[in-house]
Amino acid sequence: MSMNFVTFNQDYSYLAVGTSKGFRIFTTDPFGKSYETKEGNIAILEMLFSTSLVAVILSPRRLQIMNTKRQSVICELTFPTTVLAIRLNRKRLVIVLEDQIYIYDIQTMKLVYTIETSPNPNAICALAPSSDNCYLAYPLPQKAPPPSFSPPSHGPPSNTHIPPTSGEVLIFDAYKLEAVNVVEAHKSPLSFLALNSEGTLLATASDKGTIIRVFSVPAAHKLYQFRRGSMPSRIYSMSFNITSTLLCVSSATETIHIFKLGQQQGLSKTSSPSRKLESSRGSGDESAVESASSEMSSRKHNGTFMGMIRRTSQNVGNSFAATVGGYLPKGVTEMWEPERDFAWIKLPKSNGGNGGSGPVRSVVAMSSNTPQVMVVTSEGNFYVFNIDLSKGGEGTLVKQYSVLDSSDRMGSTDLDY
C-alpha cells in the first residue's frame, strides 16, 4: 500500500490520508484513527472541518462527495480534464484543473462560476476556511498574445493563457463571485499560497522559495517578509496557526521553519505599530529583494479591469507607510529586510522509505490547543514537535506515529520524552 495524498482539515483537528487502497481519517489530538475504507485508489481527498462530508478523487476526472457516517455517495461530478486539487469551506467547493477553476455552491452542489486560468499544473490555489471572508487566491492569469496569423478553422483551439512569468496573485471573492484585488507578491512565478482561517492574511512563496511574504486580504498590503533560507528550495507546505500569530513552512530541505507574525499591524490605520518591522541583517533578499528598485517603483495601470483593481503591493500603501514609517530605522525605510525564523524543526533522518525518489515531502500544521507543530511526511510518518513560544529556537520531537501502520493500535509508536 502506498500513500498518494495527505491533508489536514480546515482547523487541523483531523488528518486525512489517501492511499492506493482507500483512505483513512485520524484525529490529531489525541492521535487516533476515526475512519477507514479500503476501497479505491484515492488520488486526492478533502474534508469539510469535522463533518462527515469528504470529497475524493477516485479516477483522474471523477469526483465523489461522500458521507462517511452514512457510508453513502452524495453526488458525483466528472470534469473535462484531470482534477489537480480540491478546496472546501462551508460555502464553496472549489475544483482546480490545470487551466480552469470550478466553483460550486456546497449546499446545492450547483456550479456557480468557472474561472479560466493560466496553466497551473501544480494547482497553486488557496481558499479561506472562513464563510465571512470567502476569498480564493490563485496565480493571476496571463493572457496569450494574439496569434500572428489566423489558425485554420478545423484546427484545435489556441491557448488563451500562457504560464505566468511573475508572482502575482488574484484575490477572488468566491461568495460574491468577483475579483477584488491583485497582489504583486514576487518577481518570479509562485510555488505556494496559504490563507489564514479568518481569510484576512495571505502567505506567498515563489519558485525560488527563499523569501516568504504575508499580505493583508483583501487590501493587499505587505505586512511581513521572512527569509526561509539563502539557497533556493521547493516549498511543499505553508500553514498559519488558528490565531494567525505563527506561520509554519516546509520545503525540500529537512528543516521546517516557524515565523512569528506578532500583532497584525497594517490591517487598520488605527493599529499601534508595536511589532518589530526591522530584522537582523542578513544576505540579500530573493534576487536582492527581487530587485528592490524595480519593486518599489509604481507600475502603470493598463486601463483594464485588472489594472483598475491592481495595487502595487510590494510598495506599502501611503497611509500605511505614514503610520509605520517613523518606526523603521533609517537603513530600512525604503526596503524591509526579511526576518529570520522564530523557531525551527529538524525532521528525523529518513530510513529510506521514500524509495530514493528525492526529498521527503511534508505537510505541516499547528495544533489549536497546544504550542505544537504537526508534520506528516511522504514516508507516512506523523511527527509532533513542541516549540517554546517565548524563546523560540529548535523544536523538540515528542510524539511519532505511522499513518500507514496496518495495526489498529496506532498509538503503539508513541514516543514520550
Curated annotation (Swiss-Prot):
Ranges of biased composition (kind: Low complexity): 285-296
Subcellular location: Preautophagosomal structure membrane; Vacuole membrane; Endosome membrane
Gene3D superfamilies, alphabetized: YVTN repeat-like/Quinoprotein amine dehydrogenase
Membrane topology: Peripheral membrane protein
Motif mapping: L/FRRG motif: 226-230
Residue windows of the WD repeats: 1-36, 76-114, 185-225, 230-269, 300-346, 355-395
Chief location bin: membrane
UniProt region (Disordered), positions on chain: 267-300
UniProt KW keywords: Autophagy, Endosome, Membrane, Protein transport, Repeat, Transport, Vacuole, WD repeat
Protein's UniProt keywords contain Protein transport: yes
A Pfam family this chain is assigned to: PROPPIN
Gene Ontology CC, one term: endosome membrane
Family according to the record: Belongs to the WD repeat PROPPIN family.
Notes on the domains: The N-terminus might form a beta-propeller domain involved in specific binding to phosphatidylinositol 3,5-bisphosphate (PIP2), leading to the association of the protein to the membrane.
Function field: The PI(3,5)P2 regulatory complex regulates both the synthesis and turnover of phosphatidylinositol 3,5-bisphosphate (PtdIns(3,5)P2). Necessary for proper vacuole morphology. Plays an important role in osmotically-induced vacuole fragmentation. Required for cytoplasm to vacuole transport (Cvt) vesicle formation, pexophagy and starvation-induced autophagy. Involved in correct ATG9 trafficking to the pre-autophagosomal structure. Might also be involved in premeiotic DNA replication.
Quaternary state and interactors: Component of the PI(3,5)P2 regulatory complex.
The protein's name in its UniProt record: Autophagy-related protein 18
Organism: Coccidioides immitis (strain RS)
Phylogenetic lineage: Eukaryota, Fungi, Dikarya, Ascomycota, Pezizomycotina
